[in-house]
From Swiss-Prot:
Higher taxonomy: Eukaryota, Metazoa, Chordata, Craniata, Vertebrata
List of residues that carry Phosphotyrosine: 107
SMART domains the UniProt entry points to: BOP1NT, WD40
Acidic residues bias spans: 56-66, 106-116
Residue ranges of the region described as Disordered: 1-116
Region (Sufficient for nucleolar localization): 250-412
Gene: Bop1
Full protein name: Ribosome biogenesis protein BOP1
Organism: Rattus norvegicus (Rat)
Phosphoserine carried by residues: 111-112
Length: 731
């Protein structure tokens, strides 16, 4: 009956640890609770359980129910109650809402991350399935095929415009399908982007409870009694003490000694014995090994190693020191017929003398990484701007284009060809503005560097022609003609190495203004930086190979009294009164005011072909016909600072850029190589030379490629003229 009474007072909603019933879950029958004492009422523990599960609002009804139950138990303690009495004794069941509020499901928040995973490939990289049509396997072991991705960018754009959920659609890497994020997931992403916590209910700034405060408490935090072992001596500590006592007795542990304040001086060489074995082995230098025998020492050497009768007689007549071999090679039919070596004892004796008398030296081997020997050069893309591609092609000449020159402003381009014409081009459009027929092969052309003078000098045959191109500003063209017409000839004519002649009216209509006639063909013409002096090179053998003409006074002079070889080209120094003269094997720098030789540069080339001076004036480059480009640093040495062998054939022309740290070279291999040449103001830092681009475009004609190169005065552009009759602009 006690069990029955207990059953009457227990309800499924009020049992401790009972799972809360779900709406679609059937209730289970609860086993009766057995009490140990039939005469006693509910225990304290049961009361505490009921008091914890029931709310305060139902205390009165519960007490009444308990009294009725107790009365029923006391009245009939030995008999069983009928079903009607049981129904009256059982308390009413609480509502579903009250049961849910009182009891909480302990598995409510339990979840598994792998319940919703359809791809069961495991923890393997999905990149393994890149080459397969499927992306994994489902729970049944069937393949999960990748969705067809046939949508292009236009479809994606239409989805982006039409689909309102496009911004919250992501791709599942496990299955390859598109997933739509819920509002909770979007809110979670927004919180994480703002640096907040993922749980919206988490308060990081909730008030802290200072459990262990500074106030002295009356009672301890934990009232656990002390262990029994705390009153007994520790066996572990006893073993440690025993081991320490034994170590002290054995002398393993020694007490600390006070430090000795007296300094100690040691004799570094007191312990060394020169006769000791270790001392001898330290300084031992192994003897050099004997050279291995060669083919000549074989008993059956090849026929070319056997000396002839003349060589044998010559060997016998030589002194022993002069002989290359101290024996004569002999041939024997077999090894058993080889006699004993007659000089064996002598050679052993000489070997012993060498080991005894000749000193030995230990050579320290230095291990050098080959990568450290290669200079660390910057990347070409870090050295921009420089020309990288072909921009324009100037077509019009019918033969070799030997020379070209750019106007000081960079708007016009002049070119000379073997077809006897001088053409003037517009740089921006590649349009031929003017064609002047001079009646001869133009070997060199130079535009006056003075921006206030519109004048071009061209060398053809044995004359230098000065012409006014009449392009650009009309005031500039008129002032140039007026400057040439204001010349008054001297009263007493002087003997000059060249003749200045006025052109005819027909030639004047074509643009020609003056003609300077020489005794030999002219190979080069170049202007001084101010535009008043003109230097020419003649193909003669005497001291008149180089002439200097003055435009304002129409005078010519020969600066040298004797010749130092065949002159190839000349150039004026940009800042100093120097004249640079390049011969076949050397470059000489002359001081024009002092009339003396300043420096002589040795390029170590077979034949110098061209030369250019850096705008700062402290560096020079020269090209040669043996495929070398030589860089000279005048402040460093008279020998080359660096030799570049990038071209495969002869170099025809070299040039510096007036503003940018660039220089270029043209060769017969049809290529133009542009290099970065940075010159620093710090004299302790060497120039930086880095090849940055190889420009190709000219076709080889008569085994000739690029004949001349020139830079644009303001832009990082380079012009090249070739044997194919074209001029190309690279930008």
């Amino acid at each position: 009956m006690a069990g029955a009474c207990g059953k009457h007072h227990m309800s499924p909603g009020s049992l401790p640890g009972k799972r809360r019933l779900e709406p679609d879950q059937e209730p289970q029958i609860q086993e009766p609770l057995l009490l140990s004492d039939p005469d006693s009422s509910l225990s304290d523990s049961e009361e505490s359980v009921f008091s914890g599960l029931e709310d305060s609002g139902s205390d009165t009804s519960d007490e009444d129910t308990e009294e009725v139950a107790r009365a029923g138990c006391d009245k009939d303690n030995r008999t069983e109650k009928t079903s009607e009495e049981q129904e009256q004794a059982v308390p009413p069941c609480p509502r579903a809402e009250e049961a849910g509020a009182l009891t909480r499901d302990e598995y409510e928040e339990d979840s598994s991350d792998e319940e919703d995973i359809r791809n069961t490939v495991g923890n393997v990289p999905l990149a393994w399935y890149d080459d397969f049509p499927h992306v994994g396997y489902d729970l049944d072991g069937k393949r999960i095929y990748k969705p067809l991705r046939t949508r292009d960018e236009l479809d994606q754009f239409l989805d982006k415009m039409d689909d309102p959920d496009f911004w919250r659609t992501v791709q599942d890497k496990m299955t390859g399908s598109d997933l739509r994020l819920t509002d909770e997931q979007v809110a979670l992403v927004h919180r994480l982007q703002r640096g907040q916590f993922g749980d919206s209910g988490f308060d990081p700034y909730e008030p802290a409870v200072d459990f262990f405060s500074g106030d002295i408490m009356i009672h301890p935090v934990t009232n656990r009694p002390a262990d029994k072992r705390s009153f007994i001596p520790s066996l572990v500590e006893k073993e440690k003490v025993s081991r320490l006592v034994h170590a002290i007795k054995m002398g393993w542990i020694k007490p600390r000694r006070p430090p000795d304040s007296t300094p100690s001086f040691y004799d570094l060489w007191a312990q060394e014995d020169p006769n000791a074995v270790l001392g001898r082995h330290k300084m031992h230098v192994p003897a050099p090994k004997l050279a291995l025998p060669g083919h000549a020492e074989s008993y059956n050497p090849p026929p070319e190693y056997l000396p002839t009768e003349e060589e044998r007689l010559a060997w016998m007549q030589q002194e022993p020191i002069e002989r290359k071999l101290n024996f004569l090679p002999q041939k024997f039919p077999s090894l058993r017929t080889v006699p004993a070596y007659g000089r064996f004892i002598q050679e052993r004796f000489e070997r012993c003398l060498d080991l005894y008398l000749c000193p030995r030296q230990r050579k320290m081997r230095v291990n050098v990484d080959p990568e450290d020997l290669i200079p660390k050069l910057p990347r070409p893309r870090d050295l921009q701007p420089f020309p990288v591609c072909q921009a324009l092609v100037y077509r019009g000449h019918s033969d070799l284009v030997r020379c070209l020159s750019v106007s000081p402003g960079g708007q016009w381009l002049a070119s000379g060809s073997d077809d006897g014409t001088l053409r003037l081009w517009e740089v921006a459009t590649a349009r031929c503005m003017k064609t002047v027929r001079v009646g001869g092969v133009i070997r060199s052309i130079a535009w006056n560097p003075n921006p206030t003078i519109c004048l071009v000098a061209a060398a053809m045959d044995d004359a230098v022609v000065l012409l006014n191109p009449a392009l650009g500003d009309r005031l500039l063209v008129g002032s140039t003609d007026q400057l040439l017409e204001t010349f008054t000839p001297p009263e007493e004519p002087t003997l000059q190495p060249a003749h200045w002649l006025e052109v005819s009216e027909e030639e004047r209509q074509r643009g020609l203004r003056l003609r300077i006639c020489h005794s030999k063909p002219v190979t080069q013409v170049t202007w001084h930086g101010r535009g008043d002096y003109l230097a020419v090179v003649l193909s003669s053998q005497g001291h008149t190979q180089v002439l200097i003409h003055q435009l304002s006074r129409r005078r010519s002079q020969s600066p040298f009294r004797r010749s130092h070889g065949q002159v190839q080209c000349v150039a004026f120094h940009p800042t100093r009164p120097f004249l640079l003269v390049a011969s076949q094997r050397s470059i000489r720098i002359y001081h024009l005011l002092r009339q003396e030789l300043t420096k002589k540069l040795m390029p170590n080339c077979k034949w110098v072909s061209s030369m250019a001076v850096h705008p700062a004036g402290d560096n020079i480059i020269c090209g040669s016909y043996d495929s070398k480009l030589v860089w000279f640093d005048l402040d460093l040495s008279t020998k080359p600072y660096k030799v570049l062998r990038h071209h495969k054939k002869a170099l025809r022309a070299v040039a510096f850029h007036p503003r940018y740290p660039l220089f270029a070279s043209g060769s017969d291999d049809g290529s133009v190589i542009v290099c970065h040449g940075m010159v620093y103001n710090d004299l302790l830092q060497n120039p930086l030379l880095v090849p940055v681009k190889v420009l190709k475009g000219h076709s080889l004609t008569r085994d000739l490629g690029v004949l001349d190169v020139a830079f644009h005065p303001t832009q990082p552009w380079v012009f090249s003229s070739g044997a194919d009759g074209t001029i190309r602009l690279f930008s």
